[in-house]
A protein has these predicted regions:
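Patatin-like phospholipase
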Residues: 1-60, 75-276
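Hydrolases whose catalytic domains are alpha/beta-hydrolase-1, hotdog thioesterase
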Residues: 70-73
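Active-site loop->helix "elbow" adjoining a glycine-rich segment at hydrolase catalytic centers
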Residues: 37, 65-66
């Protein structure tokens, strides 16, 4: 019990923002959901808030699936709005997810991982990762969730800690986590990460974070911690849901991509409503 309490204290310390950095401001948390192409809505909301002069400063930003792709730009602020807009309305998806991105034969996904990488890599460069590291040093936190298929559990990545490593390897891992969080099962193969435990190296298969966590505010253990309110005062939580929560009846085409997307979309609608 004492070890668990110490672990929660440490996690809260990592997520708590130093008073000097946020004195006089509310402790705002932004949770961005999945939603595939609906991410264009979330991007538009953020840009619209900027133009209206109503965009809050966020101490913590979390993202899942397409929300994970938006999260770094939401985290870094309005200066990155142009890149965020280009990522979602610049027509890049049509090129990356065309016939050239299809997987040959019996692959674990309809599209190859490289198709998703082509969408993400141009917008997530060393400059962006360095900017995330700078904000992390100020005490702000950027968190992204994937789903570990092997353990059947969500995995929360502290992207600022990754960014702090600096260099090419940090940028590559940063990109890999975003690719994994957006790897919709059936459409894209799982992304494999090499990890080490007790001196033994092995691989974990990670897919879309929305499989286990349609959205999240912070790691679940912290949400249920009785001392959380005292550690994080003056908090507001903003939730950006990148889909319509009401059912949208229509005829589903009887082909693999249409059935996969429709099934996953239905599952997510229900899980979003339950999460909210």
């Amino acid at each position: 019990m004492e070890e668990a309490e110490a672990s929660l204290n440490e996690a809260a310390d990592r997520l708590s923002i130093p008073r000097s950095a946020w004195s006089g401001e509310d402790f705002n948390v932004l949770a961005i959901s999945g939603g595939a192409a609906g991410g264009a809505y979330g991007a538009g909301v953020l840009v619209g808030l900027t133009r209206a002069g109503r965009r809050p400063n966020f101490a913590i930003v979390t993202g899942v699936s397409t929300g994970a792709l938006i999260a770094p730009f939401a985290f870094l602020g309005h200066q990155w709005d142009d890149r965020l807009q280009d990522a979602y309305i610049g027509g890049h998806a049509a090129g990356a997810l065309g016939l050239g991105g299809l997987s040959p034969g019996l692959e674990p996904g309809l599209f190859r991982t490289v198709a998703l990488q082509r969408l993400i890599h141009p917008f997530v460069d060393e400059a962006l990762v360095s900017a995330v590291a700078a904000e992390h040093r100020l005490g702000r936190r950027l968190l992204v969730a994937t789903t570990d298929l092997d353990s059947e559990k969500p995995c929360v990545w502290d992207m600022g800690e990754i960014a702090l490593r600096g260099g090419v390897k940090a940028t590559q891992l940063f990109r890999d986590v975003l690719v994994a969080s957006a790897s919709l099962p059936g459409l894209f193969p799982p992304h494999r990460f090499t990890v080490e435990a007790e001196g033994v190296a092995y691989e974990e298969a990670h897919v879309d974070g929305g499989v286990t966590a349609p959205l999240f505010i912070m790691p679940e253990a912290l949400l249920h911690w009785r001392k959380l309110g005292r550690r994080m005062q003056r908090g507001r939580v903003y939730v950006l849901v990148n889909t319509v929560l009401e059912a949208a009846p229509r005829t589903t085409a009887l082909n693999l991509p249409a059935v996969l997307v429709r099934s996953f979309d239905t599952m997510l609608r229900v899980s979003y409503r339950q999460a909210l």
